[in-house]
Design a protein with these regions (language model features):
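Structural motif
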Residues: 6-8, 42, 119-121, 151-153, ...
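Active-site flanking residues adjacent to catalytic metal/cofactor-binding acidic residues
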Residues: 10-11, 45-46, 79, 154, ...
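Secondary-structure transition/turn motif
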Residues: 13, 122-126, 214, 255-262
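Extended active-site neighborhood of metal-dependent phosphoesterases/phosphodiesterases
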Residues: 27-30, 49-150, 164-184, 191-244, ...
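Short, well-ordered beta-to-alpha junction loops that form the rim of enzyme active sites
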Residues: 153-157, 189-190, 257
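Residue-level detector of high-confidence beta-strand sites
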Residues: 187, 195, 266-268
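A short C-terminal boundary segment appended to hydrolase-like catalytic domains
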Residues: 224-225, 232-276
Length: 276
């Protein structure tokens, strides 16, 4: 059966003292790519600490996640640290328009044709309310995708059980994705791994809702649990690693793999049938 493998993670590279895991997670991604040469990497923001400057990308991202075999398979979304440099210009210059968008339109979509899915890369660091250009674009992009499974990435998670505060901003994204029967939401920002049960934008459990993953485990120093969040099914606060997703037209499988190649969390679920 046709499938698409994805390797997703955020919050990777920077000075080694505060980013001790980037080299190991990049090596892990390389091992997965060796087994799955057509896999895609999804970089979930805050790729080069602390300000997303040009020299930080050059000195910290390039030697690890920015090597040609990984960079050539990477698509991304920007994080809050990227915008600590004016307009996140180094981020857009480093990844290029095809894989990052532009400062003027920093969101994009592309088909995952092998699996029949649709990928959205959104920007949680700019306006996203009902009248914003980004949300208007999102509505247009989602129109007519009733029969296509949808995966969306952006940096700040709506919910999480770690040290970073929940963000209300993505509620606009979630409302549109739920209405379009979106399947998966992938975020970084919080420096831990967490998987949520399918739910609605108002946090009500719904077997036909979207499933959120937080994967801020790319290398930045990890943070611990600070609260218990409704619908959280599994979380790890002590392991660097990546989320490997295997997408098929009728289902998806997830595996959180740590840098020692151990699968710490795994499962499989049929795609959403609500309204199809």
């Amino acid at each position: 059966m046709a499938e698409q493998v994805l390797i997703a993670v955020g919050d990777m590279c920077g000075p080694p003292r505060k980013n001790p895991g980037a080299e190991a997670t990049a090596a892990l991604a390389r091992r997965i790519l060796k087994a799955y040469p057509d896999a895609m990497i999804l970089a979930l923001g805050d790729n080069a600490y602390n300000r997303g400057k040009q020299d930080e990308y050059r000195e910290h991202y390039t030697p690890t996640w920015g090597q040609p075999d990984l960079l050539g398979r990477t698509w991304c979304c920007p994080g809050n640290h990227d915008y600590r440099t004016a307009a996140a210009t180094p981020y857009f210059e480093y990844f290029g328009e095809q894989r990052a968008g532009t400062p003027q339109r920093s969101y994009y979509s592309l088909p995952l044709a092998a699996a029949g899915w649709h990928l959205l890369s959104l920007n949680s660091e700019i306006d996203q309310d009902a009248h914003s250009p980004q949300l208007q674009w999102l509505r247009q992009d989602l129109a007519g995708r009733r029969f296509q499974p949808i995966l969306a990435i952006w940096h700040r998670p709506r919910w999480g059980s770690g040290a970073h505060r929940d963000s209300k901003k993505p509620r606009w994204f979630l409302n549109e994705l739920y209405a379009a029967r979106g399947e998966l939401v992938l975020n970084g920002h919080a420096h831990h791994y967490e998987r949520f049960a399918p739910q609605r934008p108002d946090q009500i459990p719904d077997p036909q809702g979207f499933r959120q993953f937080v994967v801020g485990t790319g290398g930045r120093k990890l943070t611990g649990r600070t609260k218990d969040t409704p619908n959280s099914e599994y979380a790890r606060f002590d392991k660097f690693g990546v989320l490997k997703l295997t997408l098929r037209p009728d289902a998806y499988k997830w595996e959180f793999i740590d840098v020692d190649d151990r699968v710490l969390d795994t499962g499989e679920q049929p795609v959403n049938q609500r309204g199809r």
